[in-house]
Amino acid sequence: MSNMTQLTEAQIIAIIKDWNFAWSLIFLLITIVLQYGYPSRSMTVYVFKMFVLWLLWPSSMALSIFSAVYPIDLASQIISGIVAAVSAMMWISYFVQSIRLFMRTGSWWSFNPETNCLLNVPFGGTTVVRPLVEDSTSVTAVVTNGHLKMAGMHFGACDYDRLPNEVTVAKPNVLIALKMVKRQSYGTNSGVAIYHRYKAGNYRSPPITADIELALLRA
């Protein structure tokens, strides 16, 4: 029976040839996502990266459950069951924290699997929300020719003289307020401002109005 199912060298080479091109494209895609999937580089690639990360939990659970139902041996069945349980608990924890953050900010960025920090910047009659990958006690705002970048991310058109005096960083369990402590202009409608943490509390951020998040996605 084993001789009938044993693959020959030619069959193995044929299988590798069939999958080689597909795997080369998959690894190229993974490389692009890992290298350029940052909000400061390309928001479009970053959103795709978040989608891929979001699929890892259910994929891990599905594979673990399949391995537990159709095990190789008893040891693999036990390990697969443990992995499935851990993946399920991590996924549930993620949803709990994301829902808490969504209730605090009202932004769909709350379901970002990479970070649970959201930077809320009020300007232009709205509040623009962006994921904050690095948790810090201070945030730098740079306005160049009327275009705002904070923490390396694009926020759109904004006059330097109309920069908000306060921004907030939302987490599932706390809202941190940062006040402008220093600013310096260096050209026409251009300058730098530094925001530093000065208080924190368990309350909601100001309501978001017409935050065209998806329309502001930019490379």
From Swiss-Prot:
Record's protein name: Membrane protein
GO BP terms in the entry: symbiont-mediated suppression of host type I interferon-mediated signaling pathway
Record topological domains on the Intravirion side: 40-49, 100-219
Family the entry assigns: Belongs to the betacoronaviruses M protein family.
First-listed, main subcellular location of the protein, grouped into a coarse class: virion
Cellular component GO terms, alphabetical: host cell Golgi apparatus; host cell Golgi membrane; membrane; viral envelope; virion membrane
Gene Ontology MF annotations: structural constituent of virion
Biological role: Component of the viral envelope that plays a central role in virus morphogenesis and assembly via its interactions with other viral proteins.
Organism: Middle East respiratory syndrome-related coronavirus (isolate United Kingdom/H123990006/2012)
Transmembrane recorded as keyword: yes
Transmembrane segments: 19-39, 50-70, 79-99
Chain ranges on the Virion surface side, renumbered to this chain: 1-18, 71-78
Subcellular location: Virion membrane; Host Golgi apparatus membrane
CDD domains attached to this UniProt entry: MERS-like-CoV_M
A Pfam family it matches: CoV_M
Membrane topology summary: Multi-pass membrane protein
Superkingdom of origin: Viruses
Record keywords, A-Z: Glycoprotein, Host Golgi apparatus, Host membrane, Host-virus interaction, Membrane, Transmembrane, Transmembrane helix, Viral envelope protein, Viral immunoevasion, Viral matrix protein, Virion
Keyword Transmembrane appears in the UniProt entry: yes
Disulphide bridges: none
Subunit organization: Homomultimer. Interacts with envelope E protein in the budding compartment of the host cell, which is located between endoplasmic reticulum and the Golgi complex. Forms a complex with HE and S proteins. Interacts with nucleocapsid N protein. This interaction probably participates in RNA packaging into the virus.
